[in-house]
Amino acid sequence: MSGNESKIYDYFSKNLISWQKNFGRHDLPWQKNISPYRVWISEIMLQQTQVKTVLPYFERFMEKYPTLKDLSKSDLDDILKIWTGLGYYRRAEYIHKTSKIIKEKHNSIFPENYEEMVQLPGIGRSTAGAIMSIAFKKKYPILDGNVKRVIKRFFAIHDNNGSDKKLWKFSENLVPKNNNDIYTQAIMDLGATLCTKKNPTCGECPVRLKCKSYKY
């Protein structure tokens, strides 16, 4: 990594962290009483689903299954009843399977190990990265749809050159040494609230001055 590249990455992460503290979302239910379990459920529910849709489902889910231990005692049919209307029902099946595995192997305590985490049903690299970063405050990247869009626009990566392998490398380099939990929430929030798919609010973006897609 060159000195100029390092400065760009540092600029990006520092500005996002500062923006998140002042303007990011802080009132989402999974941002309160943060735990690996709550982050995991929220990340699974948010896959291909908007926050406003997930909110009531997450609240109901936590009321019925406040802990991983409670969830591990559940039947799949009960989980599916709560999930009705949220769609992508395989996610509920993965949650059920994973809760049983964690109960059996880890006594219903979420594993603080990335390699073990990505072996669990329904937990891919990005979901594991979010859990490791937000819940365990470890230095791991994520690459969900919103983050991909932010990275592609900031570095002006066109679709034909935007392979996941390349984007993962950018994502890894952007994660700061400190405050990585705040940074992770920040880059997700930026993609969800300002750097949206349609009609992005570029004028309010905290990294617009070095964004290669920003139109002055």
Indicate where each model-derived feature is located.
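Charged, often flexible domain-edge or linker segments that flank or initiate folded functional domains
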Residues: M1-G3
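Catalytic cores of DNA base-excision repair glycosylases
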Residues: S6-Y9, N15-Y216
